[in-house]
Amino acid sequence: MKWLHLLSVVACVADEVYAFPSHLHGAVGHLTASRLSSVVDEAVRSAHEKRLLFDAGNEPIDVTGKHEFIPPNFEKGDQRGPCPGLNALANHGYIKRNGVTNLVETIGAINKVYGMGIDLATILTTMGVVFVGNPLSLNPGFSIGSTPKGNDNILGNLVGLLGKPRGLVGSHNIIEGDSSNTRADLYVTGDASTMAMDQFESFYDMASDEGTYDFDTFAERAKIRFHETIETNPDFYYGPFTGMIVRNAGYFFACRMLSNHTKGSHEDIMDQATLRSFFAVQKEGDKLTYKRGWERIPTNWYRRSVDYGLIDVNLDVISLITKYPELGSIGGNMGEVNSYAGVDISDITGGVLNLTKLLEGNNLLCFVFEVVKTVSPNSLSGLFSIVVPPLKLITDALGTALLDLSCPALKDLQVGGESFSKGIQKKFPGAKINASL
């Protein structure tokens, strides 16, 4: 199956523009698109081959030798960002230790170390490359933190890229969204990357009497944070992709892929020591201390034996919404706290889907992919002067996904009689940054 990608937007553009003659855009664009598709295909093929050579579950992940823990050197420009899993991969040398990685490296690493399915790994990695990195580089990549200082060309800028790649720190409403487990909302603090220790401690204290956390604990925490954000963030936005899928997947990923799956174990049970290690928290007596960027894979830690892929995310989101229906409500606050308003899915889809039908089969993924397909063309025009390559990645991925998932035909998506993008941004103040999926 040819998974190439997903996603939406970054509208804020830096002053510096890399211009290119308009009459050459078509030829260059199609050549770049073809080359980039080949890079993605090679990444998937390589990851599959390495996966066959790796006997998951029979040995702990190596954290010695070339994979020993080395914390980041921020003074030298090392990058760390909002994703604990990627930060840990960099600290152990599974991706480049400076935190500026590429497509092939990242797909292979998150599959090998964490057991993320290659389909899901490809989608998320390509998302990072297209929307916060540089897909037009000869070596397409992205920063897991912010734009590397002192080396604006570290990602190999070519023609067609507007401004500088911003890294995952600049991915609000694209990859990173409001109401996360351990990160504050961007509009509230101005920093959605650094862990908020009070939020970590609140979750840490939810451990069972045995000091563990299961799926139900993470699901309850997702519900709690949703309501906390309504009460504290006047610009809270909970979109179909960044809210229902990505935001909630952040809770599941910690449970499903960061838990220690000791030899022979198929349970996704997180313990406090593992949680502290992956979230860069050290314990001395009863005191917990956060060391930014020090996320670490524990010694004698085993990856899951069965990969966690796109369909697993779908099932987990459906399970979550079934238990806490408010987490299936697309919408946001209206500029004031406690002013949350939802958008009727039936209205968006022209009556094809409602919340009940959305939770049947693969309809949730189908709907979200349709949102991405609808929003992407205008979104990408704010990022690239040559839109063909990144847009082709998205349309290829969505076309493949929609066919594989046997998706229903959906009419043009609208909000309040306008296009989805315009309608959602007009209705919710928090949706105005980037293109907001």
From Swiss-Prot:
PROSITE patterns: HEME_HALOPEROXIDASE
Superkingdom as given in the UniProt entry: Eukaryota
Catalytic class of the enzyme: oxidoreductase
Binding site residues for heme: 83
Known cofactor(s): heme b
Keyword DNA-binding: no
Pathways per UniProt: Secondary metabolite biosynthesis
Assigned protein family: Belongs to the chloroperoxidase family.
UniProt GO MF annotations: metal ion binding; peroxidase activity
Full protein name: Aromatic peroxidase fscJ
Cited function: Aromatic peroxidase; part of the fragmented gene cluster that mediates the biosynthesis of fusarochromene, a tryptophan-derived metabolite closely related to a group of mycotoxins including fusarochromanone. The role of fscJ within the pathway has not been identified yet. The first step of the pathway is the epimerization of L-tryptophan to D-tryptophan in the presence of the NRPS-like tryptophan epimerase fscC. D-tryptophan is subsequently hydroxylated by the tryptophan 6-hydroxylase fscE to yield 6-hydroxytryptophan.
EC numbers for this chain: 1.11.-.-
Note on cofactor: Binds 1 heme b (iron(II)-protoporphyrin IX) group.
Signal keyword on record: yes
Keywords: Heme, Iron, Metal-binding, Oxidoreductase, Peroxidase, Signal
Signal peptide: 1-19
Organism: Fusarium equiseti
